[in-house]
Amino acid sequence: ELNKQILLNNQIDGEIIALDGSGFTNDYADKYYAIIRRKERKSYVKNHISIDVESRLILHFAAQRGPRFDTRFAIAAIRNIKKYNPKYILADRAYDTELIRKCINEEAKAEDQIPLKSRAKNGHYRLKSKNTFQKEIYSRRNNVESIFSVIKRIFNGTNRSRSLQLSNKETKLKNTIYNIYRTTQIQEK
């Protein structure tokens, strides 16, 4: 695939990797029409990405009909990105489960930097993370948010495809085009 070639042509450090998900609107109706019919927009596509924080390239992505839990994507993403030998994997509170933390620590052999949910009381890795959580490393997670911002600003946050299958492909295409866009920025430096 094209995305794999882009990643091969770039030097990826992979020391810090961040995970997150964001929605892309799927409605092609006008906002005014949505107000008139007194209905919210029907559905959206959830775009899950994992990025290399240093190069700001998307290493792995998946698109699914939303709303979905971020945890379903996380395990597959962690198994896919472990080839980069990350030292830290960053994610927001939505990814705070013992299963995800176990996968990060045991399979990827990395440290999880995920803030605890307010009611976290059990689990070996969850309790251990109270001592290993580093705010200065976690603060770099905002890079994944800025990538979503760039994708939605430059390549549009609304999918024009009417079918779910084409809408998922459109979202994946936006991710690949973002990587091409980012590669040109890296090469200009």
Task: List the predicted regions and their residue ranges.
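Short, solvent-exposed polar/charged micro-motifs at secondary-structure junctions
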Residues: 25-31, 123-125, 171-172
